[in-house]
Amino acid sequence: RGSXLTILPLRNISD
């Protein structure tokens, strides 16, 4: 279910 897709934007916002 969007493994990456969800982790990609999530990490960007965390930074």
Swiss-Prot record:
GO molecular function: aspartic-type endopeptidase activity
One Gene Ontology term, aspect cellular component: extracellular region
Compartments where located: Secreted, Extracellular space
Keyword vocabulary terms for this entry: Aspartyl protease, Glycoprotein, Hydrolase, Protease, Secreted
PTM note: N-glycosylated.
Tissue: Expressed in chorionic epithelium (trophectoderm).
Gene Ontology BP terms: proteolysis
Main location: secreted
UniProt superkingdom: Eukaryota
Enzyme Commission designation: 3.4.23.-
Similarity annotation: Belongs to the peptidase A1 family.
Record-given protein name: Pregnancy-associated glycoprotein 63J
Organism: Bubalus bubalis
